[in-house]
Amino acid sequence: PTVTTQPDGTVEISVTSQTAGVSAVTATINSSTQSQNVTFIADVRTAKIADLVVIKDGSEADGATANTLRARVTDAFGNTLAGQTVSVMAGNGATVAPTVITEPDGTAEISVTSQTAGVSAVTASINNSSQSRDVTFIADVRTAKIADLVVTRDNSVADGAMANTLRVRVTDAFGNTLAGQTVSVLADNGATVAPTVITGQDGTVEISVTSQTAGISTVTATINNSSLSRNVTFVADVRTAQIADLVVIKDGAVADGAMANTLRVEVTDAFGNALAGQTVSVTADNSATVTPTVTTQPDGTVEISVTSQTAGISAVTASINSSSQSRNVTFVADVRTAQIADLVVTQDDSVADGAMANTLRVRVTDAFGNVLAGQTVSVLAGNGATTAPTVTTQPDGTVEISVTSQTAGISAVTATINNSTASQNVMFIA
């Protein structure tokens, strides 16, 4: 507060301060006063980061929109320091200028950009002093796109309940996951899917697809103008295998044990999807022969061949699980092997008056004994007897032969068809 002058009338005044700036120093004696200003400057030797404040946060991780912070540099006593070079670093892939220079007020703004969503730690340093603050970058919903669509479950049963599943992942243009995004979903080939799904915190969401139609269904996920498609496969339900159809495709085969009538059986599940590789049990009645089991082809059908040595109708039955269908096929006698199976005298000992007739019944069959209708049988009679030269068999394969004579005695009657012949004697009496 006081100083004392030296012999020469002067004295030195020393002034110190911890506050940078102008200090007015006033010397007073009696009523005489004078003042002079002195300046104290901040101490760059003790420059430190006094403060680091986030002033803008939550910017998009688009590499262009910035989060900002303000760093303040002072000396050890809090005096602001202009023109100081502050080193800056940012973590998590963020981009920042490596140094900034403080303004006259000792502050400098730091701009940070990133293409990576999440938290980035920004550190400002000078001398041995540093401070860090976290800023957050968010994924850019404006550039939302389908980054991936993966089938996670395939080959489910086409029963309208069992689902194939896919996982869709939504990111922004730089691959940052986006939660809460609405994805549109479509599925073709009759498959059913929720029309929209919403992504979870990890940017993914599961898509469930069901169908009653076996085969490939293309599932498409779309957001904005971005879409991806994947195929899933539904398989027919063997648990509900049934005989969907049994159709005669060839009928009227010859009953020779070799020529076959054929049918086509179709096996599907409860929703009409063709089932390959299914074992169908087959039976045929009326002595027809059939393979006891057949196996369906990729289209769910298989041909059934039926042979018989017995002319007539045979009911063919195809069965799987508790499902069965039957169809009739017809085998016809083989005219190529027509033969005289029997020649029997039905009336004998008629009067030889040229009017009263002896009669015989001829029966024509094929090689397996099936009666043949409509067959022409040649007839001859000996000892002057008279008979029609040909007769035609009835539906039961027989026909009556009438023989008259004016000559008493034995007449040999011969019936012939193809290379088959039979003879019987009849007696005419005077």
Describe the predicted segments one by one:
Residues P1-A430:
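The feature marks long extracellular or luminal low-complexity segments
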